[in-house]
Amino acid sequence: MLSCTTSTMPGMICKNSDLEFDSLKPCFYPEDDDIYFGGRNSTPPGEDIWKKFELLPTPRLSPGRALAEDSLEPANWATEMLLPEADLWSNPAEEEDIFGLKGLSGSSSNPVVLQDCMWSGFSSREKPETVVSEKLPGGCGSLAVGAGTLVPGAAAATSAGHARSGTAGVGRRKAAWLTELSHLDSECVDSAVIFPANKRESMPVATIPASAGAAISLGDHQGLSSSLEDFLSNSGYVEEGGEEIYVVMLGETQFSKTVTKLPTAAHSENAALTPECAQSGELILKRSDLIQEQHNYAAPPLPYAEDARPLKKPRSQDPLGPLKCVLRPKAPRLRSRSNSDLEDIERRRNHNRMERQRRDIMRSSFLNLRDLVPELVHNEKAAKVVILKKATEYIHTLQTDESKLLVEREKLYERKQQLLEKIKQSAVC
């Protein structure tokens, strides 16, 4: 829970923990039982969701970080409580890059970049008032962005002054910042400024005047350093000697870029600036290829130049030689396969020829057998089974007739022998 310094009583710092609930009581629903039944002091949860989450603007650079950079003194308890969670745990530039709030400074007249959407300490029945347009003290450097130009902040100019001021200046800045923050509690910001996702408009592009050169506050460029380094790594190449410079701004769904031609006089002025300004000027992208957004698949594709497309290398005919060598070992295999096929075809052809010869011989034998059977001599349409059956019966009859003839032959032979003996006896007598 946030500290009681963000309550409806500006300028008051509560050190008693029992008074925190009293100061933050307007943030909660009434304690009546009829909260959802139209009580006297109740508000339906769906009446206006933006009234439940009223917004309080916070500076782009947190007070704890700004004071820690200037002095070696540890921040007090009030500064630690007022420090947003985004500054405590992560880089605010990365958080702005995730929620798409980095391009918010170019679309609104508010110089304060809003970070914490849930920092609210006043009643839900109060209407949001106008956007805070007044700047914070010089200790917190900010980048005031107009409709078309970038105004350099005070962080780069006052960095040397902070080193010379000492602890007395730090105490004055703390008190001034807390006083200014207490006066900002009574005002809130419209939700359309915080969540521009519903607006599908391209963000205005900020340009750098030639007279100003690259004199942009270092604190503002630190938020863009991470994304610019990613773009430099993703881009193809960077030319060192060109005069055309790409200034890239992170918008809602795509990157808007402008080409600003800086004369040689601007380069001479940049050479005379402080090392901090020179370091911030180096962060500006020089002449490079078109930058494509990597993970935004919903964004329309960027137009590509025909020269940027990689040309396909023509296929050379040199690899054909090794391919022929690779195909050569397959030739014997094809020959063996063709030989085996020819052998199979020849074998089948011989088998068919022998089968036809066997069938012809069998047919001729059946026809001859049919002619030998007396009953089937004139029957040309006799079946093979009938021919075989009748031939078998005829053979049996022939065998019986043969046996009878053999018996008769034996009888005749015996008769012959008897007659020869009678002739011999008659001759002796």
UniProtKB/Swiss-Prot annotation:
Domain of life of the source: Eukaryota
Subcellular location: Nucleus
Keyword Phosphoprotein set for record: yes
Modified residues (Phosphotyrosine): Y36
Region of interest: Leucine-zipper: 398-419
Any GO CC annotation of this UniProt entry: nucleus
SMART domains in UniProt: HLH
Coiled coil: none
GO molecular function terms noted in the UniProt entry: DNA-binding transcription factor activity, RNA polymerase II-specific; protein dimerization activity; RNA polymerase II cis-regulatory region sequence-specific DNA binding
UniProt keywords, alphabetically: Apoptosis, DNA-binding, Nucleus, Phosphoprotein
Subunit structure: Efficient DNA binding requires dimerization with another bHLH protein.
Protein name: Protein S-Myc
Lineage: Eukaryota, Metazoa, Chordata, Craniata, Vertebrata
Name of the gene this protein is made from: Mycs
